[in-house]
Amino acid sequence: LWRLDPRTGKRFRFELPTTVVQRFTLSEGRVPRVVFFGQTGTTSRNAYVADLTSSRPKCTPFGEVSFAKALGDVQVASCTPWSYRRSDRDTVPGFYFLPADFDATKKYPMLVYYYGGCVPTTRELEFHYPLSVLANMGYVVLALEPSGAIGYGEEFAARHINTWGKRSADDIIEATKAFMDAHPYVDRKKVGCMGASYGGFMTEYLQTRTDLFAAAISHAGISNIASYWGGGYWGHTYGETAQYGSYPWNNPELYVKQSALFNADKIHTPLLLLHGTADTNVPTNESQQLFTALRILGRPVSYIQIEGANHVVTDYGQRVKWQQTIMAWFAKYLQGDAAWWKGLGFKD
């Protein structure tokens, strides 16, 4: 939460007990106050009221509004900031979760998550992908903010333009290896990755670049930049920024070289493709055509459609099964337990 003085242009950041601020409202009284929802990677949402006359305001829980009470005595995974200095001395920020019953003498499979769209992953317990829950299922969970993510300055975000994953993939691969080197409790042979939308594209593209991962999940991913450019709710509009000045007819190399579909023969990692049948952002064909290619090649791939779902799965019942599907896929390939996957009615 920041304050901006419109007269001087000066700004400063308030020091709050939360890492995420959600849905705030300001008072209009003589003493400036704010009421906001906030949370961290280890605490659930709570409502706070804060006096903004100080840069370190006292934040008081507001009344009896506390989602955290629903957790009771449930132990949550720990959440720790972590960053990696690339070989070119640039920094890749991130954080990681460890199970509540973590034992450093044991080996753990690891999941790597990166942005959906180019929106950075925030340190919050109630995230769209339940990273803390996954950690407590026996994983180390590493969340990275690779090049192209917004929130780290204009230059950092602009690295996404006309690269379509190249620099971001370098960030993810280098950072994942560096994390494993620094944390010997990670089982290097049991590392999975996942992302959605542009993050789904990254999942697919990464498998054409490395054999680092033992399992991968792409939700609503883009497999063919050319077909996405001309379809979907905003493919062309997005492309006007993401590949500014580059079109299939004047820069075909970008569209082919960076698309997983045209490099499908390089993919050997077991890959799960998830897609809502009513996705207006990324058409379902983006998953269908990669699934077809990998099946022709005889590679381990599964494709599951969520009936009637748009770009994000919002129906409660579908969302529960969607989450279970993700968990079951990783349990099958990273924990050696296929019972959950089979129990959901899916075939190999």
Question: What do these predicted regions represent?
Answer:
Residues 1-106, 118-137, 177-181:
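Peripheral, non-catalytic segments that deliver or gate enzyme domains
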Residues 37, 114, 219:
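Conserved residues at the C-terminal ends of beta-strands
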Residues 109-113, 141, 303:
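Hydrophobic beta-strand anchors of alpha/beta hydrolase catalytic cores
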Residues 114-116, 275:
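The conserved beta1-alpha1 loop
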Residues 116-118, 198-199:
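Acidic helix/loop microenvironments that form the catalytic cleft of cell-wall polysaccharide enzymes
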Residues 136, 143-348:
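Active-site-proximal cap/loop segments of hydrolase catalytic domains
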